[in-house]
Amino acid sequence: MNAVNDKEAVIFDMDGVIFDSETLVFRCWNVVAEKYGIKNVEEACRECLGINAVETKERFLKRYGEDFPYDEYKGEMSELFHETAADGGLELKPGVTELLAFLKEHHYKIALASSTRKVVVESQLTAAGIIDYFDKIICGDMVKKSKPEPDIYLTAAEEINVSPNKCYAIEDSYNGIRSAYRAGMDVLMVPDMLPANEEMKEICCNILDSLFQVTDLLQKK
């Protein structure tokens, strides 16, 4: 146990918490939407924040119809996303490295619980030079049920051998917050694309403006 408080671990979401990736995803989807005349694509993307690739496709097909060429459009969006990211367009959120360094210094266990596929997660964390901070990485293709179900957070806690009630979860999306809360963790919300609604205010233990504020909070515990 660290000397700061009774929590032993911090489990991070990735997209929108560690990387400013959701802003880039929205931007790339808007390019594809303008090309093909897809309406309300930002609204569709917001509905999919925090869930895995399989469920994202299901929601797009439900919204636009079973004949919607999702795989083709998603492929174009992904290609544009990765081209932009490779050119330095995928930025770390402010305060990430400072928070990770603080957690290591104070002997927290650190895990990742991301709905994104493992190959993508590991590639992005490696490129950013922060993968070695994480004791365990759990991804969307490693669990049966996606967020908002608690599976991914329960698996992460099990992998680092820490009880869920001894973990903080850092999330930005509603589905991610529901997942961590249902797993029995104290959730710190750092809003990204969506502000905290009444449900989030009820189930989060803190709502913070940035990861710098997370570090400040833990320093005071």
Residue ranges and their predicted role:
Residues 2-47:
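Active-site neighborhood of HAD-like aspartate-dependent phosphohydrolases
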Residues 17, 114-116:
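Conserved phosphate-coupling serine/threonine residues in phosphotransfer and NTP-handling enzymes
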Residues 60-98, 106:
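Metal-dependent phosphoesterase signature
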Residues 1-8, 101-104, 117-221:
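Asp-based, Mg2+/Mn2+-dependent phosphohydrolase catalytic module
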Residues 31-36, 98-108:
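A short, Lys/Arg-enriched amphipathic alpha-helix followed by its capping loop at the start of a domain
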